[in-house]
Regions:
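Positively charged n-region of N-terminal signal peptides that target proteins for export
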Residues: 1-5
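Short N-terminal segments immediately surrounding and downstream of signal-peptide cleavage
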Residues: 24-46
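Signature of long, low-cysteine stretches enriched in small and polar/charged residues
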Residues: 101-165
Length: 200
């Protein structure tokens, strides 16, 4: 059954880019509201996606959607990955209910115990907050399997990610793919889009 799902996802990926594989593609310039009735949310995008793929195309264990805005052949250059129920609520408290002191303490803990290069707690809407993070460009890895991080490696890409609770309390993980480098413009659009996330 798992192989069937993987083959189906791969077919969807190939079919979506079958026409666009030769030339680099970028989505149109008009804002667009993406609605996912099955997952129960909508979000405003800076442009209409070229296509939408299942998140399992990139990670077979994740259930969600990949909104692709730009690609070069089969390489995704810009996309949002939206994962409803994307984290355990027990791992992240309701940020709107924390005192300033507890929020600062949580932020310190997140910075000390995560592999992200940037971590911050940001307002999403007037009623919600989220954790914004950017993956590290250089990371330490265990090359000999002894459990010790011994070698510095350079990641091919960086990603931005936001963990948030919607106004109905759903746990969303939303990621930005931005190749070859993360840009301020795309991060700004990403954060603006996240602020429009609505439960259906």
């Amino acid at each position: 059954m798992k192989l069937k799902k993987i083959f189906a996802a791969a077919f969807a990926f190939c079919a979506m880019f079958a026409v666009t594989a030769v030339m680099p593609q970028t989505a149109g310039a008009e804002p667009y509201t993406y609605t996912n009735k099955e997952e129960g949310y909508s979000i405003m995008c800076p442009t209409k996606p070229l296509g939408v793929l299942p998140a399992s195309v990139l990670n077979e264990d994740e259930k969600g959607s990949v909104l692709v805005f730009a690609n070069d052949g089969y390489k995704i250059n810009k996309a949002w990955i939206i994962i409803p129920d994307g984290f355990d609520k027990g791992d992240l408290p309701d940020l709107t209910k924390l005192s300033q002191k507890d929020e600062a303490l949580l932020l310190t803990q997140l910075k000390e115990n995560s592999a992200y290069a940037v971590v911050d707690i940001i307002p999403i809407t007037a009623k919600t907050k989220g954790v914004f993070a950017v993956t590290a460009k250089t990371i330490m890895v265990d090359t000999d399997g002894d459990g010790e991080l011994d070698t510095e490696a350079t990641a091919d890409t960086q990603m931005a990610v936001v963990f948030l609770r919607s106004e109905k309390g759903r746990a969303f993980k939303i990621e930005l793919i931005d190749n070859p480098e993360i840009t301020a413009k795309n991060v700004s659009e990403f954060r603006a889009g996240i602020s429009t996330l609505k439960d259906l």
